[in-house]
């Protein structure tokens, strides 16, 4: 990904699942990110958007599943996910908009 002016172009959405929800206690957050972004860009974007200190970023490319439809087969789109670990002492990210 070339130069991006807005960090919100890199971080697309948080992943809300049972596994990602259980990792919130360990200050580990999961986001869907732009497929061309790298770990450094993801770290800078998270730090700018949420004003937190990031300790590490792990990424995973997930292939889209082949799904059967009424008229044949289709394919879900592939996504890239970032698993972000916050530094110790960093404030938690409020993903759900409710008091903790």
Swiss-Prot record:
Keywords: Ribonucleoprotein, Ribosomal protein, RNA-binding, rRNA-binding. It comes from the Bacteria. Coiled coil: none annotated. GO terms for molecular function: rRNA binding; structural constituent of ribosome. SUPFAM superfamilies: Ribosomal proteins S24e, L23 and L15e. GO terms for biological process: translation. One of its GO terms (cellular component) is ribonucleoprotein complex. NCBIfam families: PRK05738.2-4 (NF004363), PRK05738.2-5 (NF004364). One of the early assembly proteins it binds 23S rRNA. One of the proteins that surrounds the polypeptide exit tunnel on the outside of the ribosome. Forms the main docking site for trigger factor binding to the ribosome. Part of the 50S ribosomal subunit. Contacts protein L29, and trigger factor when it is bound to the ribosome. Belongs to the universal ribosomal protein uL23 family. This is Large ribosomal subunit protein uL23. It comes from Mycolicibacterium paratuberculosis (strain ATCC BAA-968 / K-10) (Mycobacterium paratuberculosis).
């Amino acid at each position: 990904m070339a130069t991006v002016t807005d960090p919100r172009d890199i971080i697309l959405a948080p992943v809300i699942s049972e596994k990602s929800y259980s990792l919130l206690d360990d200050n580990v957050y999961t986001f869907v990110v732009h497929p061309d972004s790298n770990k450094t860009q993801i770290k800078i974007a998270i730090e700018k958007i949420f004003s937190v200190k990031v300790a590490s970023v792990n990424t995973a490319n997930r292939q889209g599943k082949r799904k059967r439809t009424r008229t044949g087969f289709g394919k879900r789109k592939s996504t890239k996910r970032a698993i972000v670990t916050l530094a110790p002492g960093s404030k938690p990210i409020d993903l759900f908009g409710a008091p903790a």
